[in-house]
UniProtKB/Swiss-Prot annotation:
Keywords from the named record: Bacterial flagellum, Cell membrane, Membrane, Transmembrane, Transmembrane helix
Pfam families: Bac_export_3
Biological process, per Gene Ontology: bacterial-type flagellum assembly; protein secretion
InterPro entries with a match to the protein in the record: Bac_export_3, FliQ
GO cellular component, one term: bacterial-type flagellum basal body
Protein name (record): Flagellar biosynthetic protein FliQ
Gene transcribed to yield this protein: fliQ
Regions that span the bilayer: 19-39, 50-70
Family assignment from sequence similarity: Belongs to the FliQ/MopD/SpaQ family.
Summary of the function given for this chain in its UniProt record: Role in flagellar biosynthesis.
Organism of derivation: Treponema pallidum (strain Nichols)
Membrane topology category: Multi-pass membrane protein
């Protein structure tokens, strides 16, 4: 049945999936950014591209490394949604 609780549950699960998929990439980018910032502070180098390039390479590397897992998680969530939709619609309007 398409109730407000069911819709909120689906939204909550979707947000959780997004956080679960994005967290490893963002955490590694954060760590690399902090390391580069500390390096810049210690050496007094204020080059803007020095912060951008390592973070971009780290993000691309993490996506390449975890891309298969991310795709599997998204596929499982999508299949679960497609399985639930007929049950929600079948009961009719509230």
């Amino acid at each position: 049945m398409m109730t407000q609780g069911a819709v909120l549950g689906l939204i909550r699960e979707g947000v959780f999936q997004v956080v679960l998929l994005v967290a490893p990439v963002l955490c590694t980018a954060l760590v690399v950014g902090l390391i580069v910032a500390i390096f810049q502070a210690v050496t007094s180098i204020q080059e803007q591209t020095l912060t951008f390039v390592p973070k971009m390479l780290t993000i691309l590397g993490m996506i390449a490394l975890l891309g298969g897992w991310m795709l599997t998680m998204l596929q499982n969530y999508t299949v679960r949604l497609f399985d639930i939709i007929p049950q929600l619609v079948r009961s009719g309007p509230v």
